């Protein structure tokens, strides 16, 4: 399981970085060709190959190797201005990869325990708020507690853990004959998030780019009831 999480995280982060660099090509290999080679490399490297023996196994191994070499070429490639492969930010898929890694890592310890996941969700949401405030003074404390090398200041991870929490609530309380209890829980969570959004708005703007707590709370205020609505449908 750990290996699966690791390699899926690597794939998402790599795809995010390649997608980001495809838009910065200036001369030489065109943006279109970079993107085409990039996608081919993705499919060859991370494609799900059937189990095989003999010649087919050799062929699949060669295809995967070709994908890795193709992506390696794109990493070392420099355009006509000498611009190399860059990591300016992680890209959308890269952020998803980091979110997946953190949330999956937490779930390895909490498993299907609703109580443990609820606590983990609360802690991650709290970290998202704290990371945008001055509640932890000092550079040392911030580095140890907030882990700034993890992008999005815990906001995206709060979204991920909200999904985990909702899934476990559905597993525990959802009932087709009596859906009201589960939907009521989600609506209550939505109201709670709306209250937090209104309370936090004077302190932070609504900004997706900055991943502010206010944006997080407004999004969750919509997410929980909407999930209940689609479940009812």
Task: Put a short name on every predicted segment.
Residues 1-233:
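Alpha-helical transmembrane segments and their immediate juxtamembrane cytosolic regions
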């Amino acid at each position: 399981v750990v290996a699966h999480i690791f390699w899926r995280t690597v794939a998402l982060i790599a795809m995010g970085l390649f997608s980001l660099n495809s838009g910065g090509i200036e001369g030489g290999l065109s943006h279109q060709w970079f993107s085409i080679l990039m996608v081919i490399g993705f499919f060859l490297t991370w494609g799900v190959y059937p189990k095989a023996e003999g010649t087919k196994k050799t062929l699949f191994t060669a295809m995967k190797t070709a994908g890795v070499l193709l992506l390696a070429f794109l990493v070392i490639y420099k355009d006509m201005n000498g611009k190399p492969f860059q990591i300016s930010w992680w890209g959308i898929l890269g952020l998803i990869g980091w979110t997946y890694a953190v949330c999956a890592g937490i779930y390895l310890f909490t498993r299907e325990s609703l109580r443990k996941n609820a606590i983990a969700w609360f802690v991650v949401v709290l970290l998202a708020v704290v990371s945008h405030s001055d509640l932890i003074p000092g550079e040392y404390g911030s580095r140890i507690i907030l882990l700034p090398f993890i992008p999005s200041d815990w906001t995206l991870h709060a979204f991920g853990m909200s999904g985990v929490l909702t899934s476990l609530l559905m597993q525990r309380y959802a009932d087709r004959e009596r859906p009201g209890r589960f939907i009521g829980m989600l609506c209550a969570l939505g109201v709670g998030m709306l209250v937090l959004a209104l309370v936090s708005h004077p302190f932070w703007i609504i900004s997706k780019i900055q991943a502010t707590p206010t944006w997080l709370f407004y999004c969750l205020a919509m997410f929980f009831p909407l999930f209940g609505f689609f479940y009812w449908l």
